[in-house]
C-alpha cells in the first residue's frame, strides 16, 4: 500500500521502505501480517539525496544489488528484499550472509543466486519461478510492483489448492505462543495499573 501512496496532486510519492526483512514483518494475534519500521523509508527523491550522501540504510543481508552499490533505488528494490525473505522462508537457508558486513555486501552485489531447487529437488517449479523473478539482479527484469508479485503468489496457491482457512493463522499463533502473549498482556496491564496508582498520589 505504501508504494501506491500519492500526493495532493495525485502523483505517486514513490515511497521505498529500504529495510524489508524478517525482523520487520510481524504477524498480529488476529493473523494479519504487518510490515513495520518505516524509520528509514524515503520517497524516491529523498532516496536519491541519501544515496548521493553515501548513506546505506537497512540490513545488508536484505538489500538489493542497486541499494548495496549506493545507487538510486525505487520500489523494485523492496521487491528484491521480499524475494530474499521468500527464498529464506521456503528454503530455511540464508541467502546472503558473509563473515563481515563488507563481505555480505559483496555477496549481494555479485554472488550467484542459487535456485531453491538446488537445495530441495521437490521445490515447486512455479514457486521457484516467482522467487527467481523477484531476485532478478536487473530491476527491469524483476517484478515491477508488489501487486504483480501478489498476483503470481495467489495464482500459485490457487493452482496448488493451498488454502489457509479464515482465522487459521490466528489459531496457530494462539496454540504456539498464546500463553506468552497472555503473560505480556498481564504484565502491561499491571504496569498501567501501577502507573495510574502513582499518578493519583
Regions inferred by a protein language model and the residue ranges of each:
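Protein kinase catalytic-loop region centered on the HRD/HxD motif
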Residues: 1-15
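Hydrophobic "anchor" residues on beta-strands that sit immediately upstream
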Residues: 15, 33, 74
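C-terminal lobe helix-coil module of Hanks-type protein kinase domains
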Residues: 23-28, 36, 59-199
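Regulatory activation segment
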Residues: 33, 46-57
Amino acid at each position: 500500500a505504501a508504494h501506491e501512496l500519492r500526493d495532493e496532486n495525485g502523483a505517486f510519492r514513490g515511497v521505498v521502505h529500504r529495510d524489508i526483512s524478517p525482523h520487520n514483518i510481524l504477524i498480529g494475534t488476529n493473523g494479519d501480517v504487518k510490515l513495520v519500521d518505516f524509520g528509514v523509508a524515503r520517497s524516491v527523491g529523498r532516496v536519491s539525496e541519501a544515496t548521493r550522501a553515501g548513506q546505506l540504510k537497512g540490513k545488508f543481508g536484505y538489500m538489493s544489488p542497486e541499494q548495496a552499490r549506493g545507487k538510486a533505488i525505487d520500489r523494485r528494490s523492496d521487491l528484491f528484499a521480499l524475494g530474499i525473505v521468500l527464498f529464506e522462508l521456503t528454503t530455511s537457508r540464508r541467502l546472503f550472509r558473509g563473515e563481515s558486513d563488507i563481505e555480505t555486501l559483496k555477496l549481494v552485489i555479485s554472488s550467484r543466486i542459487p535456485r531453491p531447487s538446488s537445495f530441495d529437488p521437490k521445490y515447486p517449479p512455479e514457486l521457484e519461478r516467482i522467487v527467481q523473478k523477484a531476485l532478478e539482479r536487473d530491476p527491469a527484469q524483476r517484478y515491477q510492483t508488489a501487486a504483480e508479485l501478489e498476483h503470481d503468489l495467489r495464482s500459485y496457491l490457487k493452482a496448488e489448492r493451498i488454502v489457509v482457512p479464515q482465522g487459521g493463522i490466528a489459531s496457530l499463533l494462539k496454540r504456539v505462543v498464546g500463553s506468552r502473549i497472555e503473560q505480556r498482556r498481564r504484565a502491561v496491564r499491571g504496569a498501567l495499573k501501577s502507573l495510574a496508582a502513582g499518578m493519583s498520589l
